């Protein structure tokens, strides 16, 4: 069983009288994480809110009912908590009633209803974590696995790192097809009020095709037949269900910097490729640069999240097409990174960026130098 980076951090939050909330896409390993957290705990109460009967136990309860349900449990595990009506109030009631006597851990695959409802009703009672598909660091940390991960790099760029894909690589495509046809959009369709799933699928395909490029809501609207506001709404839903994420353009000084541009990336390369139905090896692909960029950016953001870093992430581009793939800013320090799949391809800091940010650092990340960037 692959150990998740956030497990130890979650355990360190036990006994503080707070609800631990773990958000992440379906099938990234949240239930497995709950099982790991339950190891060596004598009295555990498990509630799976995908099950209607179990969900009913948390529908409009009073404090006495909650205390009777918990009984003498030391650990209360609530899976897929976003399906509980008024989930924030329920978690608040549990936290207030139990205090540090029992630890509550709730998971959810959607930030749509869960995070918003929780933070409105249970302010000050939540420690939040995000769980993503397996990270490069988690995979490389397995005993003797670092060289194995280097050898499997091309496979990761094509098939990604959902746990089941990693543990059953021969079935990778079939597993990803199953995720894409079922779990991927389940929460978007449930909570987003979307009546035309085919239009949503078309939008995701358009985002997949524009990987590594700036996206325009107007252009996406023309490609899908949606208006700009609906495109923006759907992208927001996809971000809140952990299918994609955005990077905004970095701009501080120069007049010609793009100030409102953004790129859309996928949290998992395999999901991006299954959306397009393309699992060709890298040697037969024309999108290697985009896959490399998506993998590095998503893996870097996983690392920052698990390290609980406050660094902010961007890309940089000017109206004259000078560009840098990835920018990080923390406490006034700016780090710039350029991504090159070919380790022999040269790159240097663009002169306009160097002039505008003379104290910034600049690094080139290739397939021979990425470990330090991700671990």
Question: Where in the sequence are the language-model features?
Answer:
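A cross-kingdom feature that marks ATP-driven nucleic-acid transaction machinery
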Residues: 3, 12-25, 31, 36-43, ...
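Short glycine-rich substrate-engagement loop in P-loop NTPases that contacts/grips substrate
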Residues: 45-72
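Conserved Walker B
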Residues: 50, 80-84, 110
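Conserved ATPase-coupling elements of RecA-like P-loop NTPase cores
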Residues: 56-57, 82-91, 116-117
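Conserved P-loop NTPase "ATPase switch" module shared by AAA+ and STAND
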Residues: 70-87
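Conserved catalytic/switch belt of AAA+ P-loop NTPases
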Residues: 88-112, 119-120
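Short regulatory helix/loop adjacent to the ATP-binding pocket of P-loop NTPases
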Residues: 112-128, 143-144
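Interdomain hinge/linker elements that couple catalytic modules in large macromolecular machines
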Residues: 132-306, 318-319
């Amino acid at each position: 069983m692959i150990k998740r980076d956030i497990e130890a951090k979650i355990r360190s939050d036990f006994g503080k009288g707070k609800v631990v909330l773990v958000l992440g896409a379906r099938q990234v390993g949240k239930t497995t994480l709950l099982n790991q957290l339950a190891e060596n705990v004598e009295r555990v109460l498990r509630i799976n809110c995908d099950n209607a009967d179990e969900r009913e136990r948390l529908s409009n309860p009073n404090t006495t009912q909650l205390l009777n349900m918990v009984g003498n449990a030391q650990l209360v595990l609530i899976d897929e908590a976003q399906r509980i009506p008024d989930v924030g109030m329920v978690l608040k009631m549990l936290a207030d009633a139990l205090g540090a006597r029992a630890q509550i851990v709730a998971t959810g695959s959607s930030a749509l209803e869960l995070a918003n409802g929780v933070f409105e009703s249970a302010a000050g009672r939540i420690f939040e974590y995000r769980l993503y598909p397996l990270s490069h660091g988690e995979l490389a940390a397995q005993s003797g696995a670092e060289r194995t991960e280097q050898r499997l790099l091309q496979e990761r760029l094509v098939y990604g790192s959902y746990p089941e894909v990693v543990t059953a690589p021969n079935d990778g495509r079939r597993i990803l097809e199953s995720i894409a046809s079922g779990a991927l959009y389940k929460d978007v369709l449930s909570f987003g009020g979307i009546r035309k799933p085919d239009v949503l699928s078309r939008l995701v395909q358009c985002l997949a095709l524009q990987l590594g490029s700036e996206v325009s809501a107007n252009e996406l609207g023309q490609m899908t037949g949606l208006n700009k506001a609906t495109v923006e709404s759907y992208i927001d839903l996809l971000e809140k269900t952990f299918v994609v994420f955005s990077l905004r353009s970095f701009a501080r000084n120069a007049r010609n910097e793009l100030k409102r541009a953004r790129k859309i990336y996928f949290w998992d390369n395999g999901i991006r490729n299954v959306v397009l139905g393309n699992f060709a090896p890298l040697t037969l692909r024309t999108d290697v640069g985009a896959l490399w960029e998506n993998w590095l950016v998503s893996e870097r953001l996983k690392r920052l999240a698990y390290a609980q870093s406050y660094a902010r992430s961007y890309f940089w581009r000017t109206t004259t097409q000078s560009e840098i793939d990835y920018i990080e800013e923390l406490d006034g320090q700016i780090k710039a990174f350029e991504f090159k799949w070919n380790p022999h391809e040269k790159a240097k800091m663009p002169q306009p960026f160097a002039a505008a940010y003379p104290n910034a650092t600049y690094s080139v990340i290739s397939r021979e130098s990425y470990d330090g960037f991700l671990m």
